[in-house]
Amino acid sequence: MKATAKAHPIQGLVKYHGMRDTERRMPYHDSISVCTAPSHTQTTVEFRPDADEDVYVIGGEEVEGRGAERIQAVVDRVRELAGFDHRVRLESENSFPSNIGFGSSASGFAAAAMALAEAADLDMTRPEVSTIARRGSASAARAVTGAFSHLYSGMNDTDCRSERIETDLEDDLRIVAAHVPAYKETEQAHAEAADSHMFQARMAHIHAQIDDMRDALYDGDFDAAFELAEHDSLSLAATTMTGPAGWVYWQPRTIAVFNAVRKLRNEEDVPVYFSTDTGASVYINTTEEHVDRVEEAVADCGVETDVWGVGGPAEVLDESEALF
């Protein structure tokens, strides 16, 4: 009853903000994202009928408190579906920095859900597994189905699931990841989202924005898709900044990257757009032809960069790749 899985983190394109059901982590509205590769999380799980307690280890450190509670929500859902109460050992490692706005919770819970479902011998499609991953992080649902994916808010626990969107943009997209370290508190931001006076304004346009993003992806329209993502980042930030806690995640270098991107676009006609989730780090979306110029301009802002492509769905790995 042991399995190992890998999943890629996500960049939110039309991001969800706030949850109407916090226990099952069901968001107020639909969302669309793209997975980033080769960044990934790898997770090994083993159900142990004779063990007395669950053990969760991330990056070599045992997880306790709220982090353990979120993992247990995913584990408990798998146990419920499998019809047993075996204890589990879970170990996970990231190939990229966590908690700076690069979607590590998405890849983490997606890999966990995929490995747990396999170890429990559940015969499930990826959209079905996405409903399990969602118990840890709604973004993880989209990391299960991979590439460009759409999480439907749905009417219930079953149809609040992710499905992949086919698009010609997958091969040419290059993502320059600008690392701007700064602590973030995404869970609290979600908890108070509806208390922002900007939240209803966001809800008023988000459904049309989802439709526009799907159309742009279906049409393979790079500029339309990533201009929408850039605008959505600003809308999300406005809602977060005007919540009760007044969260401001951006740092001076975040703004410097924004300005560098707009300068490339306006003065050099480079197809390039920025995007942020809840964090100070920045995704810069461009094409293979222009990625070197974009990376050079972003590096001039004094930030570390990586270049990523589009990542596929979560997958079960061979037993030889187990972490324990």
From Swiss-Prot:
Gene Ontology annotations of biological process type: isoprenoid biosynthetic process
UniProt entry keywords in alphabetical sequence: ATP-binding, Isoprene biosynthesis, Lipid biosynthesis, Lipid metabolism, Lyase, Nucleotide-binding
Single GO MF descriptor: phosphomevalonate decarboxylase activity
The keyword Lipid metabolism belongs to this UniProt entry's keyword annotation: yes
High-level lineage: Archaea, Methanobacteriati, Methanobacteriota, Stenosarchaea group, Halobacteria
InterPro entries recorded: GHMP_kinase_C_sf (IPR036554), Mev_decarb (IPR005935), MvaD-like (IPR049864), MVD-like_N (IPR053859), Mvd1_C (IPR041431), Ribosomal_Su5_D2-typ_SF (IPR020568), Ribsml_uS5_D2-typ_fold_subgr (IPR014721)
pH-dependent activity: Optimum pH is about 7.5.
Protein's job: Catalyzes the decarboxylation of mevalonate 5-phosphate (MVAP) to isopentenyl phosphate (IP). Functions in an alternate mevalonate (MVA) pathway leading to isopentenyl diphosphate (IPP), a key precursor for the biosynthesis of isoprenoid compounds such as archaeal membrane lipids.
Name listed for the protein in its UniProt record: Phosphomevalonate decarboxylase
